[in-house]
Amino acid sequence: MNPSPLLDLIDSPQDLRRLDKKQLPRLAGELRTFLLESVGQTGGHFASNLGAVELTVALHYVYNTPEDKLVWDVGHQSYPHKILTGRKNQMHTMRQYGGLAGFPKRCESEYDAFGVGHSSTSIGAALGMAAADKQLGSDRRSVAIIGDGAMTAGQAFEALNCAGDMDVDLLVVLNDNEMSISPNVGALPKYLASNVVRDMHGLLSTVKAQTGKVLDKIPGAMEFAQKVEHKIKTLAEEAEHAKQSLSLFENFGFRYTGPVDGHNVENLVDVLEDLRGRKGPQLLHVITKKGNGYKLAENDPVKYHAVANLPKESAAQMPSEKEPKPAAKPTYTQVFGKWLCDRAAADSRLVAITPAMREGSGLVEFEQRFPDRYFDVGIAEQHAVTFAGGLACEGMKPVVAIYSTFLQRAYDQLVHDIALQNLPVLFAVDRAGIVGADGPTHAGLYDLSFLRCIPNMIVAAPSDENECRLLLSTCYQADAPAAVRYPRGTGTGVPVSDGMETVEIGKGIIRREGEKTAFIAFGSMVAPALAVAGKLNATVADMRFVKPIDEELIVRLARSHDRIVTLEENAEQGGAGSAVLEVLAKHGICKPVLLLGVADTVTGHGDPKKLLDDLGLSAEAVERRVRAWLSDRDAAN
């Protein structure tokens, strides 16, 4: 028997709109099953997609996509959207090398109105589209779909503030599941959770679930119950508005509707059809459950936010709750998490800050052991950095655990609030370099370039796990702002010290002595440099620091070797290799230099090893490039 007769009919939203509204609940069920199977094979963001199935169906059913624009915030919940927009048969390639991207991507489909991967951009982008349509005299509609976690970021409120004062037709759908990746923090989630109407919504949902089957058997009873439900909701809304005068969003100039059940697809269609005909800024508050329809994800949405894969034989039935085997080698994130706890036990001034990335940044144990010194500020990177600056002013020792790609969002604060005042804040910059399946929006390829130009900054790049701990300890003790950047995943497997040893700031070390060719390597590129150097009898320097850079070592290597190769997992432009060239120019040294890094291009997604090979940064690719360079130079001479 065909498990998805309705879904099989749909290759575009136009096919979806041919269905009767009463068929949509069945379609949503088929879509959820298909989602379980596809993510079960490829891995990816999981719980958030299960919670957005009915909402996605309703939006594409009501809005005339792709002419009408749906702008998904972050993009974690975009898989149902991709399935309904002609990519169903490619879902097995999701986040794989050469396959579908894990986030909306304009070059992938005309239905992906705005490329995304970071949080809280949807309202601003959709507002820009709505303003453009007004200028062009178009009656197209723009819709921003944003979660309550993403709504905590300042950029979302900046866009709300702007939109409420503009005469444009914009719908903001607030998908409220009380989660980002971790449970939400801050005043806004408390406001949403305490809403009287939300409480009434929960009560009505319970009553409907328990009485619906009985009412179905009584002629006319269901229709009467729906009228009563509508009246109760209306009274509750009126009571809430009387209590609060105007809701938060109405004070921003939006007409507020909701909250409504985000898993009742037929009712969602009715509500959206009404909203599509309204003028001006509108906000629809939708209540959903992250992981809906999948008990393990419902019960633990943090664990099932993203999964590597599900057992193939049981994906549709839900996998057994079996803990994965621990990696033989610790990840850099784990090395940081252990160092942080060890350091905090020895220094009561240490405080840790994360912008809503507790699990990913390795802070779970720290929060459990030192809850009073743990600050999750929500999806608010700008605030996280300035907040750290305030702590440092009063004698605390802040450690900001942040991904490289998200540190970009707080660049002004890094310069203005930290570096110009020379405040001793340590940035533990995770996910530096290629990250793999999440693609270019999450790659950490620019931090060396944008950090090393900032006055007072110390920038370190460890080559292995033990060096990571060494450099964290070293930079923590520095009386200046410092960043230690390290990659995703496991290291090289070297033993890791339990101590708090330090090294001299701004000094590198020689890892291998050779002749003629000197490899000047930074961070994760030390390992491939060593692998290649043995075949070419080259010298390898592990620089450790990008700023201050070891000028003495660079000059010595340049004068004792015929040529230099620099290696970094960062953009070539303005990166560590550029720093080496600056040193050579400063000292009037003219030697052939091959600069190996990430060229001026947007990287792809998929297996990191394949991506590094494409970029010419795997050990094999480095050897090919160096040999070709040497051959060209020999031929030229």
UniProtKB/Swiss-Prot annotation:
SUPFAM superfamilies: Thiamin diphosphate-binding fold (THDP-binding) (SSF52518), TK C-terminal domain-like (SSF52922). The lineage of its organism: Bacteria, Pseudomonadati, Pseudomonadota, Betaproteobacteria, Neisseriales. InterPro entries: Dxylulose-5-P_synthase, THDP-binding, Transketo_C/PFOR_II, Transketolase-like_Pyr-bd, Transketolase_BS, Transketolase_C, Transketolase_CS. This is 1-deoxy-D-xylulose-5-phosphate synthase. Pathway: Metabolic intermediate biosynthesis; 1-deoxy-D-xylulose 5-phosphate biosynthesis; 1-deoxy-D-xylulose 5-phosphate from D-glyceraldehyde 3-phosphate and pyruvate: step 1/1. Its cofactor is Mg(2+); thiamine diphosphate. Homodimer. It holds the Pfam family Transketolase_C. Binds 1 Mg(2+) ion per subunit. HAMAP family: DXP_synth (MF_00315). Its EC number is 2.2.1.7. It is an enzyme of class 2 (transferase). Keywords: Isoprene biosynthesis, Magnesium, Metal-binding, Thiamine biosynthesis, Thiamine pyrophosphate, Transferase. Mg(2+) binds at residues 148, 177. One of its GO terms (biological process) is isopentenyl diphosphate biosynthetic process, methylerythritol 4-phosphate pathway. GO terms for molecular function: 1-deoxy-D-xylulose-5-phosphate synthase activity; magnesium ion binding; thiamine pyrophosphate binding. GO terms for cellular component: cytosol. It catalyses: D-glyceraldehyde 3-phosphate + pyruvate + H(+) = 1-deoxy-D-xylulose 5-phosphate + CO2. Belongs to the transketolase family. DXPS subfamily. SMART domains: Transket_pyr. Catalyzes the acyloin condensation reaction between C atoms 2 and 3 of pyruvate and glyceraldehyde 3-phosphate to yield 1-deoxy-D-xylulose-5-phosphate (DXP). Thiamine diphosphate binds at residues 76, 117-119, 149-150, 177, 294, 381. It comes from Neisseria meningitidis serogroup A / serotype 4A (strain DSM 15465 / Z2491). It comes from the Bacteria. NCBIfam families: dxs, PRK05444.2-2.
